[in-house]
Amino acid sequence: LTYYTPEYKTKDTDILGAFRMTPQPGVPAEEAGAAVAAESSTGTWTTVWTDGLTSLDRYKGRCYDIEPVAGEENQYIVYVAYPLDLFEEGSVTNMFTSIVGNVFGFKALRALRLEDLRIPPAYSKTFQGPPHGIQVERDKLNKYGRPLLGCTIKPKLGLSAKNYGRAVYECLRGGLDFTKDDENVNSQPFMRWRDRFLFVAEALFKSQAETGEIKGHYLNATAGHCEEMMKRAIFARELGAPIVMHDYLTGGFTANTSLAHYCRDNGLLLHIHRAMHAVISRQKIHGMHFRVLAKGLRMSGGDHIHGGTVVGKLEGEREVTLGFVDLLRDDFIEKDRNRGIYFTQDWVSMPGVIPVASGGIHVWHMPALTEILGDESVPQFGGGTLGHPWGIAPGSVANPVAVETSVQLRNEGR
């Protein structure tokens, strides 16, 4: 049980993890907690001769606290400290491979969920983070003091590139700031990516010329391999598009970090979709909470990320959602267990990420969205724009009217 060290004082440079652990019946919590620390750091199933060739005391993970979960039988929050030297600098991939790579299939555990990570400045400073961040994005768009407005083009699959471009134009011309490729729009037989990019670029420039505003469409660069992804991002930049998009969980953290570096070097904003997150994050006792995936994304890089709505068709509890929204946007976030924040997180100077609210929302939700998420957010109305009873153009006019009214009423204290 050398990995269970309740007397250990955590260092400022340690990465700290909070796991929700359900041991198998008959397995003591201390033993299971030590197993989590061992398996996610230097341990293996037996003592090996080569242990003597290194300093395990320097490199091992330590389970330093175990607390029972109130109201749950045989469930514990286990705190583990990992020395900084266990992780490659600037690699979210390596961090997750170490911390959650193997331990979740461990026999001694019935279930295990990573609830939160504390990323020390000594580690976060090795990452570029978001390509631009909230303030630079607003400066690029010249839009301040209100949420930015988006719309996912529907039907998500089946439109030709020309008709897709027409829908983009109608939405942007009416008053939206952004339109969006759906996460599964890549390059299918009915609409190849290059055709889509060209027709969308035409819609962008036409709507910009007519409205005098800067417009964007999240061109999904996600592809089957990294070289193809980069080719699409480069083509988007050559067309003069201001923003591209990536599905960061299906595409992978390595691909995402490569794209984020390209975006910063070339002045592109990066919109991130979290497709597949619920596979990992939805179960309450096993997997990984979305706040951990959100922290990973902020380090890997993205200017927008879908973060739940609190009011639409997709699940999201208010306090917990606001907890990880703050972890995305703010510099310094205090520990607050009511909001699911297990550790105080200091991002130092890393740029923030704008949370995107999308999924079953429409203009009637705007006052609630403005109140809950504030100005630094992007509500996205796909069906709420394209499903307007009078047509797409009136739908896209309704959204800016709703947001301006909501912001004005809030600012006047009504």
From Swiss-Prot:
Substrate binds at residues 102, 152, 156, 274, 306, 358. InterPro entries: RuBisCO (IPR033966), RuBisCo_large_chain_AS (IPR020878), RuBisCO_lsu_C (IPR000685), RuBisCO_lsu_C_sf (IPR036376), RuBisCO_lsu_fd_N (IPR017443), RuBisCO_lsu_N_sf (IPR036422). It comes from the Eukaryota. Binds 1 Mg(2+) ion per subunit. Its cofactor is Mg(2+). One of its GO terms (cellular component) is chloroplast. The modification N6-carboxylysine is found at residue 180. GO terms for biological process: photorespiration; reductive pentose-phosphate cycle. Mg(2+) binds at residues 180, 182-183. It catalyses: 2 (2R)-3-phosphoglycerate + 2 H(+) = D-ribulose 1,5-bisphosphate + CO2 + H2O; D-ribulose 1,5-bisphosphate + O2 = 2-phosphoglycolate + (2R)-3-phosphoglycerate + 2 H(+). Its main location: plastid. Its EC number is 4.1.1.39. The record marks 313 as: Transition state stabilizer. It is found in: Plastid, Chloroplast. Keywords: Calvin cycle, Carbon dioxide fixation, Chloroplast, Disulfide bond, Lyase, Magnesium, Metal-binding, Monooxygenase, Oxidoreductase, Photorespiration, Photosynthesis, Plastid. One of its GO terms (molecular function) is monooxygenase activity. The active site is at residues 154, 273. The disulfide bond which can form in the large chain dimeric partners within the hexadecamer appears to be associated with oxidative stress and protein turnover. RuBisCO catalyzes two reactions: the carboxylation of D-ribulose 1,5-bisphosphate, the primary event in carbon dioxide fixation, as well as the oxidative fragmentation of the pentose substrate in the photorespiration process. Both reactions occur simultaneously and in competition at the same active site. NCBIfam families: PRK04208.1. Heterohexadecamer of 8 large chains and 8 small chains; disulfide-linked. The disulfide link is formed within the large subunit homodimers. Belongs to the RuBisCO large chain family. Type I subfamily. The basic functional RuBisCO is composed of a large chain homodimer in a 'head-to-tail' conformation. In form I RuBisCO this homodimer is arranged in a barrel-like tetramer with the small subunits forming a tetrameric 'cap' on each end of the 'barrel'. This is Ribulose bisphosphate carboxylase large chain. It comes from Antrophyum reticulatum (Ox-tongue fern). The gene is rbcL.
